[in-house]
Regions:
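Surface segments flanking catalytic/ligand-binding clefts of nucleic-acid enzymes
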Residues: 6, 10-33, 37-39, 50, ...
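Short gly/ser-rich loop at a beta-strand->alpha-helix junction or flexible surface loop bordering the NTP-binding
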Residues: 1-215, 334-339
Length: 339
């Protein structure tokens, strides 16, 4: 059974490479153990076996760790300490994933938060201190401080190869996280996955495959709410807060034109109220010097108002007290009604 499933998986992944490239990042895509070793070299991971082949003893490795020259990622797995310190949480998690794929052996599939990291999704709301893997079976999971091995049926069409590592597809990753994380986190992941090419029909199929599992009702709600037009985690979180507070839901990334001229694309648009909402608008001009960015943003906002719309905005700090944002929205609606 395992051999037959692995053969189907390899065939499916080959078809994904040829016909469905949008499910796999346009980075290196290699196959099998050789690919994992190549990826480990790219990340400058040193294994105990490699060190022995190069003539380095266990005692020398231990001394290098004590001197702070090497960082021990796991038993028999090392990286230069200065390089490890430079890695952010996502890159460190990828290191841990590469280690886990070797220790878990064939048949283990990177999943849940770890799959989100492998796909390059927004992971701000996820804990990255544990590697998540899924074995294609109905029982036999286990959990430690650093590894959560989930038992679950994973159809071959829900697996892709990323850097040679079997990983749950974008749709399966979203559904797994939508079942097991808060709604807000699931929406951030889902919005980002749609921007990365996740197809709604694949989400529907993954929801169908997961029938009967815990958390499916909230996963279905999240699946109906996600939108590719939310272009940042802050915009996704804002949409959730609007939903929770009973706001009329806006159109996302609406183009404003006036006199036949394109003015700009706005984050949130309420046509019936004549109101535009902008989250952290300065990010649109990242790379400009601060003074020029402020000037360009002011000119853009003036042009939107000249087109007949009221504008209000908010930043990350406002998400902690969204009632303040609601008050700005209501004032903008009143100004729009008075035009």
């Amino acid at each position: 059974m395992d051999l037959a499933w692995n053969l189907r998986l390899l065939a499916q992944c080959a078809r994904s490479v040829l016909h469905n490239r949008q499910t796999i990042p346009r980075r290196i895509l290699l196959v099998g153990v050789r690919a994992r070793r190549h990826h480990a070299r790219c990340m400058e991971i040193l294994t105990r076996a490699q060190a022995h082949r190069d003539g380095t003893s266990d005692a020398q490795l231990q001394r290098a760790v004590r001197r702070g020259e090497l960082h021990r990622i796991a038993a028999g797995i090392y990286m230069r300490a200065d390089h490890f310190r430079e890695l952010d949480a996502r890159a460190r998690h990828r290191c841990a994933v590469m280690v886990a794929t070797e220790s878990c052996g064939p048949g283990a599939i990177v999943s849940h938060a770890s799959a989100a990291v492998m796909h390059g999704l927004d992971c701000g709301g996820l804990r990255l201190d544990t590697v998540h893997m899924t074995r294609n079976r109905c029982s036999g999971g286990r959990k430690s401080q650093t590894l959560h091995l989930h038992p679950a049926v994973v159809p071959a069409e829900e697996v892709v190869l990323i850097d040679g590592v079997a990983t749950t597809s974008l749709a399966r990753t979203f559904v797994d996280l939508a079942r097991t994380t808060p709604f807000e986190t699931a929406v951030v992941i889902g919005d980002c996955a749609l921007r990365r090419g996740m197809r709604r029909e694949n989400v529907d199929a993954s929801l169908d495959h997961a029938r009967g599992r815990l958390g499916m009702s909230r996963a279905r709600v999240a699946a109906t709410f996600i939108e590719p037009g939310a272009e940042s985690p802050g915009e996704s979180i804002s949409r959730v807060r609007m939903r929770d507070d009973g706001w009329p839901m806006p159109t996302l990334q609406h183009e404003i034109r006036h006199g036949g001229r394109f003015i700009g694309r706005v984050d949130f648009f309420w046509k019936e109220h004549g109101v535009v909402g902008e989250f952290d608008g300065m990010v649109k001009y990242r790379g400009d010097n601060p003074g020029r960015a402020v000037e360009r943003e002011k000119l853009r906002e003036d042009a939107i108002r000249d087109a007949g719309f009221e504008v209000f905005r908010w930043v990350w700090a406002d998400l902690r007290d969204f009632e303040r944002v609601h008050e700005r929205f209501e004032r903008a609606c009143l100004r729009g009604a008075a035009r």
